[in-house]
Amino acid sequence: MTSNGWLQIALFSAIVILITRPLGWYMTRVFAGEWTPLRPLLRPVERFIYRCCGIDETEEQSWRTYAVAMLFFSVAGFVTLYALQRLQWYLPFNPQGQAGVEQVLAFNTSVSFVTNTNWQSYVPETTMGYFVQMMGLAVHNFVSAAVGIVLALVLIRGFARHEASGIGNFWVDLTRCMLYILLPASVVVALVFVWQGVPQNLSAYVDATTLEGAKQTIAQGPVASQEVIKVLGTNGGGFFNANSAHPYENPTALTNLAQMLLLIGIAAGLTNVLGRMVRDERQGWALFAVMSILCSLSV
């Protein structure tokens, strides 16, 4: 490896270390329902969601109730995503006229995205219309990531609480994760991606003629909004088959750095959440060090 390569690794590692503690502080306060810079703006929205869904944010759930709520939510998400794929031909925002997804592939994709696995056994450009990409796959990039984060959170609560009647409320944790963490970060970074050249439109694909005279179809669509949550939620399902190796998903060095930081930021921050919740930040840094060593060995 060149000296420039080592310098890039050192710079990236330094940035991750610098953002770990602020992210841990922010996420800890979000899940505790305490003040954060975004709380005055988003708290009314949070309360509105609770009222509409009949959620008591002060109610603590046992681990069984929490697990059942998580499974119910995931099954409902699976059914919805499966139906969207099968009915794709009848849905709007499908300028390429993509047909309904075949049964086995729709099942495979639904299970994959609901479980945050995001295995793709298809070519997105020739399989999925914009409506399914936005309302199906992108939505599950959000919610499956949120489910994973809140499950890590309740594991931390299990370590931190010595005597308690519950481990939190799944619906409250999920709402706060989506509203205060995933959505704000996604909106801001998606705008940066658009600025850097990532497409964000509902236009049909463009037919072009190359310099050699060959015909080429250039795929586009609402890429930026899905790309940011793909990496922030450590999801594997990209808008294009090449994922972040595609120039429309990752056009510049700045977007590449941003995507790497998004991929690891929440995981790094959760180590600090652990330290804060057990009232010993050294425990969080110890876990961070172990994760860093394993990551370094794989570089």
Enumerate the language-model features and the residues they cover:
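Membrane-proximal intracellular helices of multi-pass ion channels
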Residues: 1-299
